[in-house]
């Protein structure tokens, strides 16, 4: 099951857990109130998983690819890692399914505090359009993930501040309604 927690304010190695002291765990319900959705699937059978197919059909995830993030597999690794960790939002949902390895998604809560979501094999997450977030590997420096999209793949990050964008405005309205 996924584990999430409020982060400390340390600015050292982002691949470390950065748990706030005292510990402040975050449950799935709190993530749901932020619009973050989570599923635990069997990554060993992702190619023929009826549960994954059901989710894809229900949520119209029509396009997929697989990305491997590691020094020896990803061209321009250092540049990409820095880009993924830059705080940003997207105009569409960001959907990731971890097939192997592990990493962290960080999302902002209603008070603009960081929540770290530990992702490992079998974890699938959907971040809503308009949420500020970032991604980093953990100390293992490796993840293989399925990227899912509604329609044609678009992965355009809008670095913070991007509060003027319609996706951000709609997300803030969603937060106000779910409070």
UniProtKB/Swiss-Prot annotation:
Catalytic activity, EC: 1.13.11.54, 1.13.11.53
Chief localization: cytoplasm
Membrane-protein topology: Peripheral membrane protein
GO terms for MF: acireductone dioxygenase (Ni2+-requiring) activity; acireductone dioxygenase [iron(II)-requiring] activity; iron ion binding; nickel cation binding; oxidoreductase activity
Cofactor note: Binds either 1 Fe or Ni cation per monomer. Iron-binding promotes an acireductone dioxygenase reaction producing 2-keto-4-methylthiobutyrate, while nickel-binding promotes an acireductone dioxygenase reaction producing 3-(methylsulfanyl)propanoate.
CDD domains reported for this sequence: cupin_ARD (cd02232)
Binding residues for Ni(2+): 88, 90, 94, 133
GO terms of biological process kind: L-methionine salvage from methylthioadenosine; methionine metabolic process
UniProt pathway annotation: Amino-acid biosynthesis; L-methionine biosynthesis via salvage pathway; L-methionine from S-methyl-5-thio-alpha-D-ribose 1-phosphate: step 5/6
Enzyme class: oxidoreductase
Cofactor(s) for this UniProt protein: Fe(2+); Ni(2+)
Catalytic activity: 1,2-dihydroxy-5-(methylsulfanyl)pent-1-en-3-one + O2 = 4-methylsulfanyl-2-oxobutanoate + formate + 2 H(+); 1,2-dihydroxy-5-(methylsulfanyl)pent-1-en-3-one + O2 = 3-(methylsulfanyl)propanoate + CO + formate + 2 H(+)
Residues annotated as binding Fe(2+): 88, 90, 94, 133
Subcellular location per the Swiss-Prot or TrEMBL entry: Cytoplasm; Nucleus; Cell membrane
GO cellular component, one term: cytoplasm
Keywords: Amino-acid biosynthesis, Cell membrane, Cytoplasm, Dioxygenase, Iron, Membrane, Metal-binding, Methionine biosynthesis, Nickel, Nucleus, Oxidoreductase
Assembly and interaction partners: Monomer. Interacts with MMP14.
Protein task: Catalyzes 2 different reactions between oxygen and the acireductone 1,2-dihydroxy-3-keto-5-methylthiopentene (DHK-MTPene) depending upon the metal bound in the active site. Fe-containing acireductone dioxygenase (Fe-ARD) produces formate and 2-keto-4-methylthiobutyrate (KMTB), the alpha-ketoacid precursor of methionine in the methionine recycle pathway. Ni-containing acireductone dioxygenase (Ni-ARD) produces methylthiopropionate, carbon monoxide and formate, and does not lie on the methionine recycle pathway. Also down-regulates cell migration mediated by MMP14.
Family that this chain belongs to: Belongs to the acireductone dioxygenase (ARD) family.
Name of the protein described by the UniProt record: Acireductone dioxygenase
Species for this entry: Bos taurus (Bovine)
């Amino acid at each position: 099951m996924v584990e999430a927690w409020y982060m400390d304010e340390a600015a050292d190695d982002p691949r470390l857990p950065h748990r706030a002291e005292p510990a402040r765990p975050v449950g799935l319900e709190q993530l749901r109130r932020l619009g973050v959705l989570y599923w635990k699937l069997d990554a060993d059978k992702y190619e023929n998983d009826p549960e994954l197919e059901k989710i894809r059909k229900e949520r119209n995830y029509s396009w997929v690819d697989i990305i491997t993030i590691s020094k020896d597999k990803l061209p321009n690794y250092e540049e990409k890692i820095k880009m993924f960790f830059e705080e940003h939002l997207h105009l569409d949902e960001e959907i990731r399914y971890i097939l192997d390895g592990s990493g962290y998604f960080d999302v902002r809560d209603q008070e603009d505090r960081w929540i770290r979501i530990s992702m490992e094999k079998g974890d699938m997450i959907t971040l809503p359009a308009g949420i500020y977030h970032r991604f980093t590997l953990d100390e293992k420096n490796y993840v293989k993930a399925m990227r899912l999209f509604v329609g044609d793949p678009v992965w355009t990050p809008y670095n913070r501040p991007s509060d003027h964008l319609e996706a951000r405005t709609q997300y803030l309205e969603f937060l106000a309604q779910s409070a």
